[in-house]
Amino acid sequence: MLDEMAHAGPEHLDQQFIEGYDRKQGYPDAETDIAAFEAHGLDQTSSVVDFGAGTGQFAVPAARRFGRVTAVDVSPAMVSALRAKAAAAGAGNLDCVRGGFLSYSPGEPVDGIYTRHALHQVPDFWKAVSLQRIAGMLRPGGVLRIRDLVYDFAPGEAGAVFADWFAGAAADPAAGYTAADYAEHIRTEHSTFRWLLEPIITASGFTISDVSYQGKLYGAYTCVKSA
């Protein structure tokens, strides 16, 4: 079995990094992702699991709209920070659990699963295993929402795409991701090509109902488990 802690990225285990995590992430708005679930019928009676939940940028607002949200992260420090944020928000229906794609099991089937910028932490073989496990956690017709850094270009375009990416990076590492951060991601993380990821998703028992890309690097998928 893969050591999920070893693939978490050392920064996600570091308390100082976590304290500035939301600022570095740019405070992403969860509304689009929540709306994607609601468009497929999820509501205040629904159960949702958030894998790689981090500091709860999705999980906390999602707890206001869904019946039960379980936030899962491999980092003990992230889980601790998330529990504090959930308590401050009065989110009594938000459970915070240490675990990952390969280790967590919800017991009863759930209605929706969300993951943002976490699937790239595992190699492609383990992405396939993770997605099959996720399919097993969802009820028939359940919804998977994926956001991740995915390469939507031919290998020969990599130099030009990465040069543009680096040019738009933050100068201050406290305020955002720098060119050095992006270069480290390419070297050490497991982002994959779109033309590899999508067949893995469908082979895992999902129909891709919606997909959108920001530039050639950031993909968002809404997937429905086959009945």
Question: Model-derived features: where do they sit?
Answer:
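A short glycine-rich, Lys/Arg-flanked "PGG" loop and its adjoining helix->strand segment in the class I
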Residues: 128-140
